[in-house]
Structures are given as C-alpha cells and as structure tokens.
Regions:
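Ribonuclease/tRNase effector modules and their secretory precursors
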Residues: 1-87
Length: 87
C-alpha cells in the first residue's frame, strides 16, 4: 500500500519541529502499531531529537480505510510511558 502525507500533516510537522524524514520513517517502519478504531491506527516510535538527544515518542495517525494509507496527524511527546505498549 502507498502512504501519503496530507498537507495538514506537513504543516503540523514543520510547526512541531519534526522532519518529514522522521514522519516517513515512523509511518513506514514503526516500533509499535496501535489500532485506535476501525480504519485508524497509530504508528509510533521512540526518536531522539537534537540538540540534546532527548527521547520523544513520535505518534503518526494513519487512516487505513482505503487503498491509500493517509497520514492525518502527527505529534511528539515526552510522555513515552503513557502511550508505549498500550493495546
């Protein structure tokens, strides 16, 4: 399946200091996938961010209800333990 980024996601990523390379990496090869509802999943990975290498959880929300997988929103959080491993 092909993955596409919405313009909204591109704007969010830029505003939140998340490179498109990170968005693509997490969307294509996440450490975890969490089904949040029918047709929507969260793909997430732990990623170090400069300048100090602090570890954040990058959460990529993907609409998987069609032939295209569309990334609809993205954010990063330092509260890894809150979201890591939830099912």
């Amino acid at each position: 399946m092909s993955i596409v980024l919405s313009e909204h996601v591109r704007q969010q990523a830029a505003r939140r200091g998340i490179s498109e390379a990170i968005v693509w990496a997490v969307a294509e090869a996440p450490e975890q996938v969490v089904q949040v509802r029918d047709g929507r999943e969260v793909r997430q990975s732990r990623v170090p961010f400069p300048p100090d290498g602090m570890m954040y959880l990058v959460r990529v929300f993907v609409d998987v209800s069609s032939d295209l997988e569309t990334v609809v929103t993205i954010y990063r959080t330092s509260r890894i333990e809150k979201y890591w491993g939830i099912a």
